[in-house]
Regions:
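Glycine-centered, phosphate/nucleic-acid-interacting loop/turn motifs that mediate DNA/RNA or nucleotide
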Residues: 24
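Short glycine/proline-centered loop/turn elements that form peptide/ligand docking sites
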Residues: 3-6, 13-16, 33
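Conserved hydrophobic/aromatic packing and binding residues within compact polymer-binding modules
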Residues: 17-20, 50
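Residue-level "edge-of-site" marker
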Residues: 20, 33, 66
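Arg/Lys-rich, alpha-helical DNA-contact motif
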Residues: 2-8, 27-30, 38-128
Length: 128
């Protein structure tokens, strides 16, 4: 299959596929005499793995390590646990910040009497 087909099957943009090739997340594909890239089912599976990992928020270096681990099914998954735990910790931190932000926004809205901007608690709070 060609890159457009891979893009359609995986839901990953063509430019992103090319980028993943450049950074080593996808192997360089074989090429036809015309120079067009040719992909197989393993490329579809690998790209699906990369996409899912990226959707879960893993950075490229973590995805690279996870791909490497995937190719060694007999190895311990300790490194995968470490990577996933670090990602979970980052998600928990973001959730905490978002929870605080939500509370701040609710408070600002509740404290604003809706009259004039000169007395607007929202504007005052943002201005510091």
């Amino acid at each position: 299959m060609q890159i457009g087909d891979l893009s359609q099957r995986s839901g990953v943009k063509i430019e992103t596929i090319r980028y993943y090739e450049r950074v080593g997340l996808l192997p360089r594909p074989d090429r036809l005499a015309s120079g067009r890239r040719v992909y197989g089912e393993e490329d579809v599976r690998r790209l699906g793995f990369v996409r899912h990992a990226r959707d879960m928020g893993f950075d490229l270096s973590s995805v690279r390590v996870l791909l490497s681990l995937k190719e060694k099914p007999g190895e311990s998954c300790g490194e995968a646990i470490r990577i996933a735990q670090a990602q979970l910790d980052a998600v928990e931190e973001r959730l905490s910040r978002l929870t605080d932000l939500r509370a701040d926004l609710k408070r600002m809205i509740a404290e604003c009497d809706g009259r004039q901007v000169s007395d607007c608690r929202i504007i005052e709070t943002i201005a510091g």
